[in-house]
A protein has these predicted regions:
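Mature catalytic domains of secreted/periplasmic carbohydrate-active enzymes
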Residues: 1-174
């Protein structure tokens, strides 16, 4: 997408070339799996003021872009918000209690998990990273899906010296 809007170039490809040229390992960081719940505020609207009741852009669709600078792009590919909000979603502090996909978190759809999986596998295949960091507990979508385990397996099969990092591990996961 960065080739079509924004910088109009493949940013990760530039980093991969630079790392290879300098003899450095390439690391890629992934944060999108929790976009499902973390972007839920984009579905909301103002409760007061002159924009009271006007929904934020997390509810926009590709059709809403006709005649606008983002025509042809689907905001749902960014926000992934075509789903019910999690329990207590209007409480900004609640999201941390739902980090492990529990405590009333709206579980991600199969399509969302598949999209994350496909994009991550594509990045591994294109850029051959040595390190992958997931901003998650254990692996992506743990414990509700084996998607993260399949991604880690793919990296290790492609690069036996590869390293996978997760944000939060307990003693059972180390």
């Amino acid at each position: 997408l960065s080739q079509n809007i924004g910088p109009k170039k493949d940013i990760l490809e530039g980093w991969a070339r630079a790392a290879k040229k300098a003899g450095l390992p390439l690391g890629i960081s992934f944060h999108a799996d929790h976009a499902w719940t973390w972007f839920e505020p984009s579905q909301r609207y103002d409760l007061k003021g002159d924009k009271k009741g006007v929904y934020y852009d997390g509810n926009l669709t590709k059709e809403d872009g006709k005649g606008k600078w983002w025509e042809g792009l689907d905001p749902q590919m960014l926000y992934q918000q075509n789903h019910p909000m999690s329990q207590g979603s209007w409480d900004n502090g609640r999201i941390h209690a739902q980090w492990g996909w529990d405590n009333g978190a709206c579980p991600p759809s199969k399509e969302f998990v598949t999209n994350f999986f496909d994009r991550t596998i594509d990045a591994i295949n294109r850029y051959n990273p040595d390190l992958i960091y997931f901003d998650v507990t254990v692996l992506p979508f743990y414990p509700i899906s084996d998607c993260g385990l399949k991604i880690a397996t793919h990296l290790y099969n492609k690069n036996p010296r590869g390293v996978v990092f997760g944000k939060i591990l307990n003693d059972d996961h180390k």
